[in-house]
Amino acid sequence: MELAVIGKSEFVTGFRLAGVRKVYETADIAATESVVKSVLEDKSVGILVMHNDDIGNLPEMLRKNLNESVQPTVVALGGSGSGSNLRDKIKQAVGVDLWK
């Protein structure tokens, strides 16, 4: 299983320097959407890393697919909505809102 990273240049550069081979630099939402669809079909990708803001800009149906995806597991980093996203992921995994 491999790690894949999708995003703007400033987001993916560190992953590229760290040796991640599947790094997809995208300039706009249309390119991001296209790359996300192809990575979701790639059976060699085990973890997909994206910026939280980029995920938020995707169409609702594709966001739903990412949130429900088991393989690859989608990890959202950065952005203003990270805390609530983490809360939702924990709630989905455990079945209980642990922050209440």
Curated annotation (Swiss-Prot):
The keyword Glycoprotein does not apply. InterPro entries: ATPase_V1-cplx_f_g_su (IPR008218), ATPase_V1-cplx_fsu_bac/arc (IPR022944), ATPase_V1_fsu_sf (IPR036906). Keywords: ATP synthesis, Cell membrane, Hydrogen ion transport, Ion transport, Membrane, Transport. It is found in: Cell membrane. GO terms for biological process: proton motive force-driven plasma membrane ATP synthesis. Disulfide bonds: none annotated. Transmembrane segments: none annotated. GO terms for cellular component: plasma membrane. The keyword Ion transport applies. It is a peripheral membrane protein. One of its GO terms (molecular function) is proton-transporting ATPase activity, rotational mechanism. HAMAP family: ATP_synth_F_arch (MF_00312). Belongs to the V-ATPase F subunit family. Component of the A-type ATP synthase that produces ATP from ADP in the presence of a proton gradient across the membrane. Has multiple subunits with at least A(3), B(3), C, D, E, F, H, I and proteolipid K(x). This is A-type ATP synthase subunit F. It comes from Methanosarcina barkeri (strain Fusaro / DSM 804). The gene is atpF.
